[in-house]
Amino acid sequence: MLNPKVAYMVWMTCLGLMLPSQAQSNDYRPSYHFTPDQYWMNEPNGLIKIGSTWHLFFQHNPTANVWGNICWGHATSTDLMHWAHKPTAIADENGVEAFTGTAYYDPNNTSGLGDSANPPYLAWFTGYTTSSQTQDQRLAFSVDNGATWTKFQGNPIISTSQEAPHDITGGLESRDPKVFFHRQSGNWIMVLAHGGQDKLSFWTSADTINWTWQSDLKSTSINGLSSDITGWEVPDMFELPVEGTEETTWVVMMTPAEGSPAGGNGVLAITGSFDGKSFTADPVDASTMWLDNGRDFDGALSWVNVPASDGRRIIAAVMNSYGSNPPTTTWKGMLSFPRTLSLKKVGTQQHFVQQPITELDTISTSLQTLANQTITPGQTLLSSIRGTALDVRVAFYPDAGSVLSLAVRKGASEQTVINYTQSDATLSVDRTESGDISYDPAAGGVHTAKLEEDGTGLVSIRVLVDTCSVEVFGGQGEAVISDLIFPSDSSDGLALEVTGGNAVLQSVDVRSVSLE
């Protein structure tokens, strides 16, 4: 859960800035990214698949377009793209709001909250008491396949007094429980974030209700982690195969409030070992640990209970790092497009790699393709294409010293430019002229990521464009940049150009995306 004090300050300072600076026919609402039906959303919660249904819970204010009255919103899908809005899953009540958490299936009914014929699904969340601003950990359960959720009568399951020996903030900074069953030890594991102390704590339970502290993972115990990376939040933890080997490794994913490549919050992942009580981190590489180099990928979590026959680790995050500031009036916050996360060796380094889920192909139609064509300085390709919901894929061999530029959401005076600069192997997103950037000091600028040519000299770039966002995937997905943009409706053009040398286009595929 993002820091409530910061969110409250943003709310209070921005109430007078809610009107957009330019008229928009759809209030910038995306075409194929999830947004709440109305009002405020931040990070996803409790991502779980139950049967054939994907469940998305999320931090939500159901009464206003600002942070506050936080509960778990709920939506379901059978394909991770078409979402049905559902009633509030876990409400704020009696002065206690429902902050971030996770869900898991209890097939053996170890919690005793279901029965052997109908085991429960469980959701752990942070209870935020508004009067004291303190946080404790709570439990809810479902015995109807996630349709409705009941709060456990014995809440909290970890009180502020139980947290006290491990929390120097007096209950102000202990939140976002990640819970899973650890097969090797036969225990349930809870990972808590302590943003004010830059640490995670690990707890165990035999029954999902009674918890015992086991260890802390502190920033000082992670070799190579910068001291500038502070305010740890929203942990996730899972085993991930190392592609091309028979090995798996434990991964901890979290969202620091400060220290990301684009400034402010961002999502990082580290590998290590876990013995059922403590996590030992591998030395980190600052060049590979960040999952996204853009400004708008925050509070990522992964879906659990995904069948082995599927085998994917699918993650999503909220795209909004500006509080109430973005120029939308009926909604705030959108979900990143779901992406797979894997771990593989790229060149000489081990990388986390991400790609949009393949289901996207089922809702996209090719508009134009090119193959084996050389583009030279002064040429502009793709300029006949118009669209605000696109999937653009470009694979090319750049000349030494060349810069390949793909402009999206291009208009008379607006464009968002994705560049690949061959001389320093840099992928970038330039929002300087992307549209409305007046709403926040961090809304413009250029975000960069390192992207090396492959062994043959090929560079691959994939760009998901929607009404108010770009998500750029470079190479095999080892370089990712996600950013919000707010152009005018009329800025719907596309342009592919090169400067400083030629580029041989191995393939180009521009696809229109539509949920209809």
From Swiss-Prot:
It is found in: Secreted. Optimum pH is 4.5. Glycans are attached at residues 109, 210, 372, 419. Optimum temperature is 55 degrees Celsius. This is Extracellular endo-inulinase inuA. It catalyses: Endohydrolysis of (2->1)-beta-D-fructosidic linkages in inulin. InterPro entries: ConA-like_dom_sf, Glyco_hydro_32, Glyco_hydro_32_C, Glyco_hydro_32_N, Glyco_hydro_beta-prop_sf. Activity is stimulated by Mn(2+), Fe(2+) Ca(2+) metal ions and DTT; and inhibited by glucose, Mg(2+), Zn(2+), Cu(2+), Hg(2+), Al(3+), and Fe(3+). Its EC number is 3.2.1.7. Residues 1-25 form the signal peptide. Changing residue 419 to K: In strain: AF10. Changing residue 130 to V: In strain: AF10. The gene is inuA. PANTHER family: EXOINULINASE INUD (AFU_ORTHOLOGUE AFUA_5G00480). Its main location: secreted. Plays an important role in biofuel production. Pure nonhydrolyzed inulin can be directly converted to ethanol in a simultaneous saccharification and fermentation process when combining A.niger and S.cerevisiae. Endoinulinase can digest fructooligosaccharides with high degree of polymerization (DP) values (>20) into short molecules that may be readily hydrolyzed by S.cerevisiae SUC2. Thus, introduction of an endoinulinase gene into S.cerevisiae will improve its inulin utilization and ethanol fermentation through collaboration between the heterologous endoinulinase and the invertase SUC2.
